[in-house]
Amino acid sequence: MDSQDCPCAAGGTCTCGDNCKCKNCKCTSCKKGCCSCCPAGCAKCAQGCVCKGPPSAKCSCCK
């Protein structure tokens, strides 16, 4: 499995799943959100977003 570095600090909630490739994810200000549906390069998604869902699926930020 790919290296996953997604430590969640107290006071924050992380959306990074077990199979996400988030590096140094700070939950209070997670800049590398793991989107399950947004296509790679989605300008509205967090930069460095690791997308695991099918390209046919779109989340609210991409609609």
UniProtKB/Swiss-Prot annotation:
Domain of life: Eukaryota
Binding site for a divalent metal cation 4: C34, C35, C45, C49
Coiled coil: none
Residues binding a divalent metal cation 7: C51, C59, C61, C62
GO biological process, one term: cellular response to zinc ion
One MF term in the entry's GO annotations: metal ion binding
Positions of a divalent metal cation 6 binding: C38, C42, C45, C62
Beta: annotated span: 1-30
Alpha, as annotated region: 31-63
Chain sites annotated for binding a divalent metal cation 5: C35, C37, C38, C51
Residues reported in the UniProt entry to bind a divalent metal cation 2: C8, C14, C16, C27
Entries under InterPro entries matching the protein: Metalthion_dom_sf, Metalthion_dom_sf_vert, Metalthion_vert, Metalthion_vert_metal_BS
Chain positions recorded as a divalent metal cation 1 binding sites: C6, C8, C22, C25
Protein's job: Metallothioneins have a high content of cysteine residues that bind various heavy metals.
Entry protein name: Metallothionein-1
Organism: Columba livia
